[in-house]
């Protein structure tokens, strides 16, 4: 019987994509106020402290996360790729790229996530999804095409840095999939705290100073919502969809970011930008209308944590 992937998992993936998509044009507004290292660190500081604070409230104190020893290498690898390298590369890329173009380039994260999931983690591939990925790549190539230094058509270094960030997050997504049945708030919160400590520590060691509180506060809030809550929802989606399909649904994020960059911040665009957007939108449509009917087998899941917020209704149990 053909059926759509679990509705709750899909909604979690789309909510995660909306929050993360909004964070890109918002974070770009602070690129000139601090270094890429410091900005990435503060974004993840907001994420980590906010999520671990929610976890403490949920559990009314500290509870052991219940991670098996064999799961720690996966989680630490995810933190290194997605929490340390990815955001720094993105902030460096944003310095020479418009938020609208950077947002659309982030569609490549879903492509790279799916490729890694299919090649190394043996997830199933669907022809519609493969065609959709090809359209997204075509759009990415258009956005990366060298052009005038207007910021609307990055080309060169800016695009390469953002593609590098996408690869880091694709690795992160597949590594996180290996521990996705553990406490989502703990996984996302720990990733934020470690990423913040590394990035802020490096920035301070290089002689950089923390920004004023009126600059730091909105950055922390953007990090909490766009990186923290978004990541917790993403982990929940991974449980029901796997890395490849969660990455495909997450493809809505770049369009949210581009819409904010153009509609709110008035960024200019180019014909190549709109052509790329059409390719990527067509690719996303193929992902969202995907149906699959291959057999699934899930091992028994043992949950040792209460669900927050109402997490038992946000993912399917076997």
How would you describe each model-predicted region?
Residues 33-85, 112, 168-172, 188-207:
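Transmembrane alpha-helices of multi-pass small-molecule transport proteins
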Residues 30, 39, 43, 93, ...:
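Hydrophobic/aromatic residues within transmembrane alpha-helices
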Residues 10-14, 68-78, 125-137, 159, ...:
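Cytoplasmic-side transmembrane-helix entry/capping segments in multi-pass membrane proteins
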Residues 35-47, 92-110, 154-167, 213-227, ...:
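Structural signature of hydrophobic alpha-helical transmembrane segments
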Residues 18-24, 52, 56-101, 106, ...:
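Specific transmembrane alpha-helical segments of multi-pass solute transporters/efflux pumps
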Residues 1-43, 47, 151-178:
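Glycine-/small-residue-enriched transmembrane alpha-helix faces in small-molecule transporters
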Residues 51, 116, 128-147, 199, ...:
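Hydrophobic transmembrane alpha-helices of multi-pass small-molecule transport proteins
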Residues 17, 40-42, 87, 101-108, ...:
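Helix-helix packing/entry segments at the starts of transmembrane helices
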């Amino acid at each position: 019987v053909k059926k759509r992937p679990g509705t709750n998992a899909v909604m979690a993936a789309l909510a995660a994509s909306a929050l993360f998509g909004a964070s890109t044009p918002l974070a770009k507004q602070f690129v000139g106020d601090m270094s890429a290292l410091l900005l990435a660190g503060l974004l993840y500081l907001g994420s980590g402290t906010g999520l671990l604070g929610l976890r403490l409230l949920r559990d009314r104190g500290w509870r052991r996360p219940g991670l098996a020893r064999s799961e720690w290498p996966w989680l630490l690898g995810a933190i290194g790729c997605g929490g340390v390298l990815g955001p720094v590369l993105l902030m460096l890329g944003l310095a020479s790229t418009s938020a609208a173009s950077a947002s659309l380039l982030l569609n490549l994260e879903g492509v790279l996530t799916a490729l890694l999931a299919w090649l190394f983690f043996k997830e199933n591939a669907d022809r519609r999804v493969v065609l959709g990925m090809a359209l997204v790549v075509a759009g990415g190539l258009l956005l990366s095409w060298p052009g005038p230094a207007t910021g609307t058509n990055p080309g060169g270094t800016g695009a390469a840095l953002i593609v590098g960030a996408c690869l880091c997050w694709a690795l992160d997504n597949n590594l996180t999939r290996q521990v996705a049945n553990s406490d989502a708030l703990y996984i996302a919160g720990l990733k934020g705290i470690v990423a913040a400590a590394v990035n802020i520590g490096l920035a301070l060691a290089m002689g950089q100073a923390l920004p004023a509180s009126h600059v730091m506060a909105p950055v922390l809030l953007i990090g909490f919502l766009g990186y923290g809550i978004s990541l917790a929802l993403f982990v929940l989606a991974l449980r029901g969809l796997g890395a490849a399909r969660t990455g495909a649904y997450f493809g809505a994020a770049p369009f949210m970011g581009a819409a904010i960059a153009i509609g709110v911040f008035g960024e200019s665009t180019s014909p190549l930008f709109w052509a790329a957007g059409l390719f990527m939108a067509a690719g996303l449509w193929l992902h969202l209308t995907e149906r699959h009917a291959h057999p699934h087998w899930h091992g028994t899941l043992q949950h040792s944590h209460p669900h927050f917020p109402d997490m038992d209704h946000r993912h399917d149990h076997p």
